[in-house]
């Protein structure tokens, strides 16, 4: 089934990242293309759950990055936000400033205690609020490894009962738009 294949691909992807077998595939990419892809995928899910999803791109630069991996980061963070938010809102904000892409996913979901925040990036780590949810507990561990592979950082701010905010920052060079267009 599709679900089984997706779970196997998740496991294989995790082990490849964990063993340093993955390398970034860099190419010019417009930041708005990333946010548009994520918005297109997650807007229907948010609407089905009765959640408000806000997507905002502050600076639309063309950068040299691994577009698929940045989308995977956003995908995993938004997927978790959808999973652990029963009512309220979720936001995705991207910005490019001073050579750094900043991607922020914030939700009004269940939030986490300090102790849970210490464990949440661990492989196969499933918090008590995830007991009835699908998955291996690898999503955030995969995100952390992709962010590290791309030379970035991830930060979590959360409070039990008040939601979570994940901030990813990755250095990446801006690309001249003429150069980017001639390569496409």
Q: Model-derived features: where do they sit?
A:
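Conserved catalytic submotifs in the C-terminal HATPase_c
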Residues: 25-30, 47, 52-61
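Short conserved segment of the HATPase_c
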Residues: 112-124
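Short alpha-helical Gxxx[C/S/T] motif in the catalytic ATP-binding
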Residues: 139, 143
